[in-house]
């Protein structure tokens, strides 16, 4: 609907986000991994037809503004908005006093079109970031895919690991520098691709906005190796490795039918289905047999109707 109004009024389609999230400013120490990075958010919005993403630096001063002050200073004076599209449960301003009823009144006074879009439902309940987060935290990646309309994914850089997978005949790529929420511990069928830099039209801050090019991962990949054909199916393990007495939680991925060097490359891992829980095996041979079964399960995975590579 934002794209509709932009076309109708012959202006750019803008989206506004806050960075960092307001709850981190109001409640220091409450940080938790986000579902997406700011750069990923910019890329998804750009794909959806948004021309510019306005990033407001979240400060206590900004959060102290009353709702009408925010409306006047940001939407009217700074952005000169001609149309505004919001969800019915949107709240803003000090102590979340602003709502869509007030927005409609103020937009009418300012000569700004206003539209409230209905929520998108799944099984009779509105889709929200809280539902997505809960699904990911519980390892319900199939549910997360339905809620998002795409597989949930994370990105990280391939680093040197213990190389136990290679000794077992199943080499894995160990991913580091992941900035978003990892699903629950377990083994998953995944789809892996090379994470390319997204160039998104993003405006940071007010009242003096600037533009930056958003990338999916700030770490510079130092590998000059030729990337493998992507996308490629794989089996991913999240969690410690109890069979070898390891306690560190990590993400490692075995790419099906691939041999090569991925060190330094930034990979994106899409979670397609959960295969099983993490468990301790009595011997490396028992682990090998289970890995064979996991890989066969990945080969048997079929894309849900309506989705395509």
Identify the function of each model-found stretch:
Residues 1-37, 43:
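N-terminal catalytic cores of NTP/NDP-binding nucleotidyl/phosphoryl-transfer enzymes
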Residues 3, 7, 149, 291-296:
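Solvent-exposed alpha-helix faces
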Residues 45-47:
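ATP-dependent adenylation/nucleotidyltransferase module used to activate substrates
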Residues 162-309:
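Phosphate/ribose-recognition catalytic cores of enzymes acting on nucleotide-derived substrates
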Residues 14, 52-56, 82-86:
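Divalent metal-dependent hydrolysis catalytic cores, especially in the metallo-beta-lactamase
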Residues 61-171, 278-292:
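Classical nucleotidyltransferase
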